[in-house]
């Protein structure tokens, strides 16, 4: 049986054979007050349920479909908000970067820096992120097969950073349709020699209008998809929630309703406990 790697985010163990970690929050920082409200709710729920938690938000959505779409407050203001969240709630933070110059300043504040799916093969960006020594979350590109993630992990290892988490977010099947291949989780584990795999259930539910300027979504299918992913035995779940999804400034159609967070996570935790309590069956 292949040994599963453990990546440490502060005092949190992230591994495929350990209790799942929630990487949850909001899509983009809309305001300081909303970030505080959403983070507080996540902290209350995860503390109650005993779920390890890392808060997620973006300071700049640099890859929006339309030039007119809201991008966020920017790095300087975003890092101030992240620091306040850490000071207030004691949470770990994950956020994404898009430019080489952002790597070190962001790593100085947050606990995990994320390599966006569209940039996952950009070697110069990979090198800059690796050199910070931070934990890295790699979003698997929609165009990449599960087995190819091993090459990205190798790039980070060549730069002396093996603190890598891999994130599945669906693959393109035809135009504008994302599908999650549940067999892909095991392929990713093997290709990366046991790296922790997490599942971005929110973005996997995006459904684009081929002529539109923003992504649609299928948030009503979040529970089914999340259960399916967790049932494969993975390290964590990645999700975004909002108190009023239809008013969210980015990816509202796939955002999870914040008031449904506790019953949802309660089910996911029970399922994760059940799956990881089974004796492994090895088939050659």
From Swiss-Prot:
Identify the GO cellular component terms for this protein: cytoplasm
Keywords of the record, alphabetical order, are: Cytoplasm, Lipopolysaccharide biosynthesis, Transferase
The pathway noted for it is: Carbohydrate biosynthesis; 3-deoxy-D-manno-octulosonate biosynthesis; 3-deoxy-D-manno-octulosonate from D-ribulose 5-phosphate: step 2/3; Bacterial outer membrane biogenesis; lipopolysaccharide biosynthesis
Cellular compartments annotated? Cytoplasm
Q: Which Pfam families is this protein grouped with?
A: DAHP_synth_1
GO terms, molecular function? 3-deoxy-8-phosphooctulonate synthase activity
Query: Which top-level enzyme class is recorded in the Swiss-Prot or TrEMBL entry?
Result: transferase
Entries under HAMAP family matching the protein: KDO8P_synth (MF_00056)
What's this protein's name? 2-dehydro-3-deoxyphosphooctonate aldolase
Organism, by scientific name, is Photobacterium profundum (strain SS9)
* Name of the gene this protein is made from: kdsA
């Amino acid at each position: 049986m292949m040994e599963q790697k453990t990546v440490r985010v502060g005092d949190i163990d992230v591994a495929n054979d350990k209790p799942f970690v929630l990487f949850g929050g909001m899509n983009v920082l809309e305001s300081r007050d909303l970030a505080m409200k959403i983070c507080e709710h996540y902290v209350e729920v995860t503390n109650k349920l005993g779920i390890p938690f890392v808060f997620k938000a973006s300071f700049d959505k640099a890859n929006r479909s339309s030039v007119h779409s809201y991008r966020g407050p920017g790095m300087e203001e975003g890092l101030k908000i992240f620091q306040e969240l850490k000071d207030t709630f004691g949470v770990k933070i994950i956020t994404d970067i898009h430019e080489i110059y952002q790597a070190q300043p962001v790593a100085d504040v947050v606990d995990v820096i994320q390599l966006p799916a569209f940039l996952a093969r950009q070697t110069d960006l990979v090198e800059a992120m690796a050199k910070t020594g931070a934990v890295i979350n790699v979003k698997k590109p929609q165009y990449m097969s599960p087995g190819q993630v091993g090459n990205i992990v190798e790039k980070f290892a060549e730069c002396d950073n093996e603190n890598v988490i891999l994130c599945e977010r669906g693959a393109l099947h035809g135009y504008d349709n994302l599908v999650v291949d549940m067999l892909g989780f095991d392929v990713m584990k093997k290709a990366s020699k046991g790296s922790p795999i997490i599942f971005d259930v929110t973005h996997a539910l995006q459904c684009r209008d081929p002529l539109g300027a923003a992504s649609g979504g299928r948030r009503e299918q979040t529970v089914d998809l999340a259960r399916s992913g967790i049932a494969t035995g993975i390290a964590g779940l990645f999700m975004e929630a909002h108190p009023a999804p239809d008013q969210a400034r980015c990816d509202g159609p796939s955002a999870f309703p914040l008031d449904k967070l506790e019953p949802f996570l309660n089910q996911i935790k029970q399922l994760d406990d059940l799956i990881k309590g089974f004796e492994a069956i090895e088939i050659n």
